[in-house]
Structures are given as C-alpha cells and as structure tokens.
Amino acid sequence: MYDVITVGSATLDVFARTKFSELIKIIDPKGETDLLAYPSGSKILIEELDFTTGGGGTNTAVALSRLGHKTAFIGKLGKGTNSDFIHKELVKEKVALL
C-alpha cells in the first residue's frame, strides 16, 4: 500500500553551467524582470552539465518520498540511456514504478 501514487510525466533535465552570461533588465507595461542573456550566435564554454530527473509526476513522487511518504509513480518510460537514468534515480529516491 502506498501513501501517494503520482501519475504524470518523467523527463530528463539538463542544466549547463557557464560563467559566460549576463543579466539584462527588461521593462514592459507589466513591470520589470531580469533575464539571463548570452551573445547571439556565439559559442559558450560549458563548465559543467548536471543531469536530473524532471517532470511533474516524478518530481512530486520524489519530493513526497523525501518527506517520508511511501510513494509510487505511474507514467511512460521509453527505452534507452535516458530512461535507464530516470529509473535508477527513482529507485534511489525510494519511488516505486507501477
């Protein structure tokens, strides 16, 4: 028996870390915001890549598992390296796959 069963997406998120960016301020009628900007058409040195699981279904299941709930996930995983990574991460986070 599970405390929570989530249904949803399972994705692989990739975060690229670099020092070659700048913040620019955009002002429009709704207010102002800062955006992360890179030079158009240029190559950017990526210092580190981080791979994590993402998607509403898996993120919710992992978060609740970390809070001590017994969780399971229902969703579609394909075949291949990315799916293997997601599966291993969910097992590591104590999320059952149904």
Regions found by a protein language model. Give the residues of each.
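A glycine-rich helix N-cap at a beta->alpha junction
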Residues: 89-98
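Alpha-helical transmembrane segments within multi-pass membrane transporters and channels
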Residues: 76-78
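Glycine-rich phosphate/adenosyl-contacting loop at the front of the ribokinase-like
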Residues: 1-74, 83-85, 92
